Amino acid sequence: GSLYIISSVFKNNKGGLAPNTLDSELLPPERETFIIGNLIENNNNVDAPATQSTNLSLGNGVVIAGGNNNVIKNNVIANHNLYGVIITATADVNYWPAHGNRVESNLIINSKRADIASSGLSNLGNCFENNYFNTSIPPGLQTLNNCDSSFYPLSADLSGMWSSLARVIQTSDGNYSQGDWRTFEAPANQPNMPIMDELMSFGYD
């Protein structure tokens, strides 16, 4: 809980951001991640290095998989082959629905399957408000699951969850496209964050 991802850029990866719940974690479910003011674009790169679990997020901007009480706000999310933002239940040893997530005031465009989506059984209290987008699964998702309105049980659409489970099966034997990090050119030197320059001036290097 209380993880803040703010004013950052995520692009040309397999997937953008994917807060998720696994039974192997210390205190599941995942909860209270704040994704605010980021640029998340073009995360469809099959050649990016990846583990099996990373491959599951391929082609998505933000995936909340079995997470609770997360906030996705004021982001630009563009050009993804599957979903811009999807809130979905997930299955590990246990079934983990997604509850109480808020998607607000984002620009979400050019997603091939849907810009915003909700999938899975028993998801409650997820809301969508003031987002600019073109497509949603199910249709009418923001209108009927607005943050200031009553909840309508649209989240019973299962297409997103089945898509994820199909990819789990597909990648279970390690047979999926990925790059080798050892062959990538080293990136150019990047500027430090201002706080790091200040710490280094005190000898913390």
Predicted regions and their residues:
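Acidic, glycine- and Ser/Thr-rich low-complexity intrinsically disordered tracts
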Residues: S111-D205
